[in-house]
């Protein structure tokens, strides 16, 4: 007897295993995931030599010691519409992860149903259409009532839901990194516009000084013409110069207005609440890049972190698509009361219990599962290729911005020498005027080359500040990858 039971158990096990194996759909085609760039590939070219420095710090703008800039950035971070949109994307990604996770949990619902029906005398339940109280039938009208609890659980043995939840969590982590990328773009954008405006203020001051010098020359030449001491050519030449300077002044004032309006839109200020921006000196520029990039660059660039999480999410989606080829199991159950007579609904004899284990075997699907897997794998490989190119672009940004900044530093050193040379010439002209060896007009006009070279120096300083902010942005702006968000 025992041997017969063991034989039956063994036979059932063999049949069950055979059913499970045969119930798996055939994966006709699935390629391996594309390779991601290795950390040792993330470095600058050997012929690029830049000054070494550390990574940018969080809230990097505070190191510039500019209260106006601090106030503008804080206002931007507290009221920016793009940042608010990014945070809403975080919430959406989180809710999607919660939704998928909830679908894999035990589902319990209370059920109440009242069904007033007339039983057909020619149907499957035709005996109940008779009016025979002795037999417990008082048809053809019945009022069936059902109350109870319904429960269902999907046994995720192969990880279909688990992988989908992991992909949603990856998308949420990507959204967190994207929010940091938006913050970085906003802060650097505000700083660049702010210092562009400061450079315009200083340029306007130099142009007004230039105009004062030329205006003195115009009046001096006009006086000489009036006294018949010289021809009108120098006078009209000076007039042409002052008109050219007036044109430059008008252009710079227009540029200040344009920059202010761009800044207004970026910080989210209205027509009447734009803060006044007072002129300040341009900050000192910190140059240099970290000694090595490698994996550290991936962790410090929020855009790369977002791409990395999207890659991971795509790989989880592939796992979920593969798991669909295996049999799926679920369990449904009902416990409650059911009666075709309302007066007997809550009696003990109306109790009902249903236990329904389910098995789904994907035998023939017309190629749907394979098409889904192939498309999901292709999307994942596309994301990997996009990530690899983003990493290469990030290294390029560091190299290009670092090289540009170093070139500007070299140009500034040479321009500073030119400024000093023209100042020497100006001092010599003033000394000659003090000794009575030259006229006041010549001594005054000797300042024009100095102002011109100072304008060139200012333009280089402005470009250096903007470029240093761009380099800092390409290094991540002090961002560090946040701890991984996992589902509890």
Swiss-Prot record:
Q: What's a single GO CC term here? A: cell outer membrane
Q: Does the keyword Lipoprotein apply?
A: yes
As for membrane topology, the entry says:
Lipid-anchor
* A Pfam family hit: OEP
Q: Looking at the record's lineage, which domain of life comes first?
A: Bacteria
What's one GO MF term for it?
Answer: efflux transmembrane transporter activity
Which InterPro entries does the record associate with it?
Answer: OMF, OMP_efflux, RND_efflux_OM_lipoprot_NodT
Q: Which SUPFAM superfamilies match?
A: Outer membrane efflux proteins (OEP)
Q: Which coarse location class applies to the principal site listed for this UniProt protein?
A: membrane
Lipid-conjugated positions (N-palmitoyl cysteine)? 24
- According to the Swiss-Prot or TrEMBL entry, at which residues is a lipid covalently attached (S-diacylglycerol cysteine)? 24
Keywords from UniProt, A to Z, are:
Antibiotic resistance, Cell outer membrane, Lipoprotein, Membrane, Palmitate, Signal, Transmembrane, Transmembrane beta strand
List locations, semicolon-separated: Cell outer membrane
Q: How does it assemble?
A: Could be part of a tripartite efflux system composed of MdtN, MdtO and MdtP.
Task: Provide the function of this protein.
Answer: Could be involved in resistance to puromycin, acriflavine and tetraphenylarsonium chloride.
What name appears for this protein in its UniProt entry? Multidrug resistance outer membrane protein MdtP
Organism listed in the record: Escherichia coli O6:H1 (strain CFT073 / ATCC 700928 / UPEC)
């Amino acid at each position: 007897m025992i041997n017969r039971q063991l034989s039956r158990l063994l036979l059932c096990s063999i049949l069950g295993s055979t059913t499970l194996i045969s119930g798996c759909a055939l994966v006709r085609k699935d390629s391996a995931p594309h390779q991601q760039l290795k950390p040792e590939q993330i470095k600058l070219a050997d012929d690029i030599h830049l000054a070494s420095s550390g990574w940018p710090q969080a809230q990097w703008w505070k190191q510039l010691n500019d209260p106006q800039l601090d106030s503008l950035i804080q206002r931007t971070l507290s009221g920016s519409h793009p940042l608010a949109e990014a945070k809403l994307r975080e919430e959406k990604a989180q809710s999607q992860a919660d939704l998928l996770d909830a679908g894999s949990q035990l589902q319990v619902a209370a059920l109440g149903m009242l069904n007033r029906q007339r039983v057909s005398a020619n149907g499957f339940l035709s005996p109940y259409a008779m009016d025979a109280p002795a037999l417990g039938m008082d048809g053809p009208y019945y009022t069936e009532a059902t109350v109870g609890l319904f429960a269902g659980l999907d046994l995720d043995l192969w990880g279909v839901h688990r992988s989908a939840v992991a992909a949603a969590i990856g998308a949420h982590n990507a959204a967190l990194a994207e929010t940091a990328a938006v913050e970085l773009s906003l802060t650097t954008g505000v700083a660049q516009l702010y210092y562009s405006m400061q450079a315009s203020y200083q340029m306007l001051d130099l142009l007004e000084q230039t105009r004062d010098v030329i205006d003195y020359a115009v009046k001096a030449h006009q006086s000489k013409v009036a006294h018949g001491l010289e021809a009108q050519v120098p006078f009209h030449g000076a007039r042409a110069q002052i008109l050219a300077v007036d044109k430059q002044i008008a252009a710079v004032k227009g540029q200040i207005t344009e920059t202010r309006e761009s800044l207004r839109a970026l910080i989210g200020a209205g027509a009447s609440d734009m803060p006044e921006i007072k002129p300040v000196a341009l900050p000192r520029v910190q140059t240099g890049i970290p000694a090595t990039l490698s994996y550290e660059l991936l962790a410090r660039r929020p855009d790369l972190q977002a791409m990395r999480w999207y890659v991971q999410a795509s790989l989880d989606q592939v796992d979920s698509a593969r798991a669909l080829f295996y049999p799926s199991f679920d369990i449904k159950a009902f416990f409650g009361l059911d009666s075709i007579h309302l007066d007997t609904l809550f009696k003990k004899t109306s109790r009902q219990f249903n236990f329904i284990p389910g098995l789904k075997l994907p035998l023939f699907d017309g190629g749907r599962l394979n098409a889904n897997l192939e498309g999901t794998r292709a999307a994942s490989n596309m994301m990997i290729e996009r990530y690899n190119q983003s990493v290469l672009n990030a290294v390029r940004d560091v190299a290009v911005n670092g090289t540009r900044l170093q070139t500007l530093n070299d140009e500034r050193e040479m321009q500073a020498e030119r400024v000093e040379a023209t100042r020497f010439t100006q001092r010599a002209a003033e000394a000659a005027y003090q000794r009575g060896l030259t006229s006041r007009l010549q001594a005054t006009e000797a300042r024009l080359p100095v102002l011109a070279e100072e304008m060139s120096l200012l333009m280089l300083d402005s470009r250096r500040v903007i470029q240093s902010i761009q380099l800092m942005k390409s290094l991540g702006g002090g961002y560090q990858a946040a701890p991984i968000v996992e589902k509890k």
